[in-house]
From Swiss-Prot:
Gene: atpI
Protein name as catalogued: ATP synthase subunit a, chloroplastic
Family: Belongs to the ATPase A chain family.
Subunit organization: F-type ATPases have 2 components, CF(1) - the catalytic core - and CF(0) - the membrane proton channel. CF(1) has five subunits: alpha(3), beta(3), gamma(1), delta(1), epsilon(1). CF(0) has four main subunits: a, b, b' and c.
Organism this protein belongs to: Triticum aestivum
A GO MF label: proton-transporting ATP synthase activity, rotational mechanism
Main subcellular localisation: plastid
Annotated keywords: ATP synthesis, CF(0), Chloroplast, Hydrogen ion transport, Ion transport, Membrane, Plastid, Thylakoid, Transmembrane, Transmembrane helix, Transport
UniProt-listed Pfam families: ATP-synt_A
InterPro entries: ATP_syn_F0_a_bact/chloroplast, ATP_synth_F0_asu, ATP_synth_F0_asu_AS, F0_ATP_A_sf
Record's keyword annotation contains Zinc: no
Regions crossing the membrane: 38-58, 95-115, 134-154, 199-219, 220-240
HAMAP family in alphabetical order: ATP_synth_a_bact
SUPFAM superfamilies: F1F0 ATP synthase subunit A
Length: 247
């Protein structure tokens, strides 16, 4: 029986897992500020992929759409329907915002699984998907908060703040707390799911052959897309709620 070799192999796998940790960050010093370079680099890559894909697909629009043009028209129609469902008839001005959120998060999430970030060596730390960093998800959530405050104020003016005392002033603390929990839930849900997916893959690769974690990686691609959809749907719902009233 090969009990001892198997035990040694298992212990080695557990030792490898013990070495999985959150690495150091790579910073740029600009003036008196420390800039988180890892997030900026990967975010620029994602933005370049998005802009490049759009330019290539629709640089020469045709009356009879090509495959690339068809795909982006379908994506636009999907985002438009999502915005209309959640926001209502005044959805038009918010389609670019919701679309930007959805596409950036979707491509960022998928880049973590499909792009070989880790082969690029940095002086400190390593590259990963932008949404694998809490700074990115918090920034996206704060942008969403600013958007629904702007939507409510532009529609109702200062009377927007009446929602905090409806249906009764007793609920004022809870209604105020709700505006703090929205960005928290958005940011930590997205960050936690993407980070957990990458950690699960790292642990499985350390324990078993590479072929076995592949189904988990495909599941990660699916959940990454779902997370982008959830974020965009909630962002649109919050904007619609701020324009319509307290629910």
């Amino acid at each position: 029986m090969n009990i001892i070799p198997c035990s040694i192999k298992t212990l080695k796998g557990l030792y490898d897992i013990s070495g999985v940790e959150v690495g150091q960050h790579f910073y740029w010093q600009i003036g008196g500020f420390q800039i988180h370079a890892q997030v900026l680099i990967t975010s620029w890559v994602v933005i370049t992929i998005l802009l490049g894909s759009v330019v290539i697909a629709v640089r020469n629009p045709q009356t009879i759409p090509t495959d690339g043009q068809n795909f982006f028209e379908y994506v636009l129609e999907f985002i438009r329907d999502l915005s209309k469902t959640q926001i209502g008839e005044e959805y038009g001005p918010w389609v670019p915002f919701i679309g930007t959120m959805f596409l950036f998060i979707f491509v960022s999430n998928w880049s973590g699984a499909l792009l070989p970030w880790k082969i690029i060596e940095l002086p400190h730390g390593e590259l990963a998907a932008p949404t694998n960093d809490i700074n990115t998800t918090v920034a996206l959530a704060l942008l969403t908060s600013a958007a629904y405050f702007y939507a409510g104020l532009s529609k109702k003016g200062l009377s927007y703040f009446e929602k905090y005392i409806k249906p009764t002033p007793i609920l004022l603390p809870i209604n105020i707390l709700e505006d703090f929990t929205k960005p928290l839930s958005l940011s930590f849900r997205l960050f936690g799911n993407i980070l957990a997916d990458e950690l699960v893959v790292v642990v499985l690769v350390s324990l078993v052959p590479l072929v076995i974690p592949i189904p988990v990686m495909f599941l990660g691609l699916f959940t990454s897309g779902i997370q982008a959809l959830i974020f965009a749907t909630l962002a649109a719902a919050y904007i619609g709620e701020s324009m319509e009233g307290h629910h």
